[in-house]
Amino acid sequence: RYAHAIPHIDQETRLSNNRFILTLRCPDARGIIHAISGALLELEGNVFEQAQYTNESTGVFVMRTRFEANTADVEVVRARLETATAHFSPTITLRTENDLPRILIMVSQYDHCLVDLLYRQSHGEIAMDVPVIASNHEACRVIAEQYDIPFMYVPVESGVDGSKAAAESRLREIIEEYRIDAVVLARYMQILSNDLCRDLEGRVINIHHSFLPGFKGARPYHQAYDRGVKLIGATAHFVTPDLDEGPIIEQDVERVEHHQTANDLAQIGRDVERVVLARAVKLFAEDR
């Protein structure tokens, strides 16, 4: 099994439990950073990373801070930060650095993104927990077993009334049972219902080739080859009821040459997809 054959890195041993990640979002105003800094000083805190940005067109201020405090009690830290920033009415998230997000990976038959994510997670490149994998096909069960991760087969029968609804009901059960924080569609080839998209808003990440909507449907890379495209790309985005139009998280492209075949383009596309999805999941897992 891969989990035993490779040098597994225990995420919790490398992360101190009195280190925190804070994100804050609110209307821009004077004194926000001063208020946070004062609260951290009272907690005998030490800042390791700090990034902030004000969108001048919307007037929204966002900030991410990774810091250490004199306590491991997240509620004590949260209360101090909320008190210090109450005047600004912010939206705050706070967690200890070793409280890893629990990610459900969903896949159909293409396994390149799944394998890449599991490899990176097992080598400590992405700080996340993958407690379960779900699929509408059995093809990737062996990969889940190699990593000692439970595999849930959730079939969706085309043309059968109620099949999709039953599958999504089962997915909701899995999300609740495994206390899932986010879902990653690693080439999961089913469209989620509008209700599920709304209920999981901001918690579902998808990967697709950047040709949409120019090359829809089956065999997009063959369509691209026929049209003589010069760039192969991929986009990772949050899922919304509007198909493939959710907020973009990460993108990349690779240049292709005229002598490359449709199969070459598909191979390049798979490489770009797995890298872009891994970057997006890493950004999400680190609250960036």
Where are these regions (language model features)?
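Donor/substrate-binding cores of folate-linked one-carbon enzymes
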Residues: 137, 147, 163-166, 178-288
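Histidine-anchored nucleotide/phosphate-binding helix
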Residues: 111-122
